[in-house]
Amino acid sequence: RLWGGGRKTPPEPKSTTPAALGAEGPDSQGSVERRIRPRKNARQGTKALIIDDSPTVVAALRKVLRSAGYLTREALDAEHGLTLMEQDAPDLVFLDIILPGMNGFGALRAIRKNPSTQHVPVIMISGNEHATEQFYANRIGADDFMKKPFSRFEIFARIENLLDHELVPRRKTDTAAGSAQDAPIHTSPVP
């Protein structure tokens, strides 16, 4: 009796997979839609740099990105990450805010001040969802913000937001500036 001699059969867990939900599920519209809509991936061989002091987070991001054809490099601190960027600039950076030594904000400032890396899109990562962190990350020049823990879907949704028409990650300001520079200037005669 102490170990549950009179067993009760536990209720069947409800499945939340898109196939199990079908079209009738209460939240199925969002769940099914995101999986049916084809994901827009960056080009094969896109280089991503992961800077995070958690080996678990680094391993998870590396696995997800490599499974989609990305080439990854990893650093457990900002200083090493900046060195890797100098050696071979990536197409995209995932940058944790809380790091030993230089924090993510300091690293982001260094990335934006360096002419050889200032064009690289940066997705900041943090275990905190405080609006102040997001505000400072955006103000310093982050292109997006991702809260830990994150899903595979969120990783690719953040990347997709940064892809240009050639499926290359670009800074939001770069694409806006590029399209403004390419737009024809229309002048009308002054009466």
Where are these regions (language model features)?
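Active-site beta3 strand of CheY-like receiver
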Residues: 88-94, 99
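Acidic catalytic/metal-coordinating carboxylates
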Residues: 77-80, 103-109
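Alpha4 helix (beta4-alpha4-beta5 surface) of REC/receiver domains from two-component response regulators
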Residues: 62, 106, 129-144, 157
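The feature encodes the CheY-like receiver
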Residues: 100-103, 118, 130
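C-terminal output helix
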Residues: 150-160, 167
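Short hydrophobic/Thr-rich beta-strand motif most characteristic of the beta2 strand and flanking loop
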Residues: 69-76, 84
